[in-house]
Amino acid sequence: MKILAVDTTSTTFTAVLIDGDKTFAKSFEVGKSGHSSLILPTIADLLAEGGVEVKDLDGIAVVVGPGSFTGIRIGVSAVTAIAYGTGAKRIAVNSFELLAYSRESGVLAIDAGHGHTYTAKLENGKIVSTEFVEEKDSATLPKDKITTTSCSVVTALDNIVRTKWAENNFVKVFEPYYMRKSQAERNNEI
């Protein structure tokens, strides 16, 4: 089993290569605009480090959101092209799954930009609801119960992808998960 997994939904870029029981990973801060220039060279470096050629990938995974609109589009587009070219099986991962990894309950929060927040309620290890919280309403969030970080994103992504692979939890098409309209869509409504 050779699987490439990518997360471009936040200011941290993460790429993981799973090859049987081995894991190779690269994860670093890129800010708000570094994903597009780094994704393909980083994937190439990671594959070279693992001694795996693109054509040998059995699976490809991507975090589909929520998160940065541009980041989501970059990650989904890049891995979709690879999946089409290789015929690799596709695994979609939700950003909240990464935050929920190894947790049982609480409120998960992701920076939505401009002071807004994407939230999810976690009960018994399952996400039971999600919500987009505007800046003006963020004061109502239960600060003492909010989780904004998980264990290592590499660890969470590695384990979630391995589990989905074992469960044959594949998708035909990567669907970006946006919890709100893009800035351009919101501007067109004015």
Predicted regions mapped to residue ranges:
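N-terminal beta-alpha supersecondary unit
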Residues: M1-G59, F132-V133
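Oxyanion-binding and handling regions
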Residues: M1-I18, K22, I91-I190
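A general structural signal for well-ordered alpha-helical segments in protein cores
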Residues: S36, L40, V79, V154-D158
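DPxDG-like acidic metal-binding loop motif
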Residues: G59-K89
